[in-house]
Regions:
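N-terminal leader/targeting and accessory segments in enzymes
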Residues: 1-108
Length: 109
């Protein structure tokens, strides 16, 4: 499976840009979500159902982690950022994002 992040440039202005996070409850991911949310990005994300302390961070922003599923990748999603805990060819969100040709960036990028 191809990673669609080669030669990717993110916008300088995140207002209205829809970014989906796979593994949104991770410590680093939640911090990035918070930054991009305050820059005006539209945020969705998926993760396991287990409760983590980062759920409180997400809830303060009015966000909730969705269960993994291809349906999370709607027509509005413009970028996908994912945790290294998930693989492009194994996670249903990522499989759908790649199928649609969306830019997929691993969190560390």
């Amino acid at each position: 499976m191809q990673n669609n992040s080669l030669n990717l440039s993110l916008p300088e202005d995140f207002r209205g840009v829809h970014i989906h996070f796979v593994g949104i409850k991770g410590t680093g991911m939640a911090a990035l979500v918070e930054i991009l949310f305050h820059k005006g990005a539209v945020i969705t994300g998926s993760d396991v159902s287990e409760r983590f302390y980062t759920d409180e961070v997400l809830e303060r922003l009015g966000l909730k982690a969705l269960p993994f599923g291809a349906a999370n990748i709607t027509d509005d999603v413009q970028y996908v950022i994912y945790s290294s805990a998930y693989k492009l060819d194994k996670n249903p969100d990522l499989i759908e994002a790649v199928r649609r040709g969306l830019p997929c960036l691993i969190y560390t990028q």
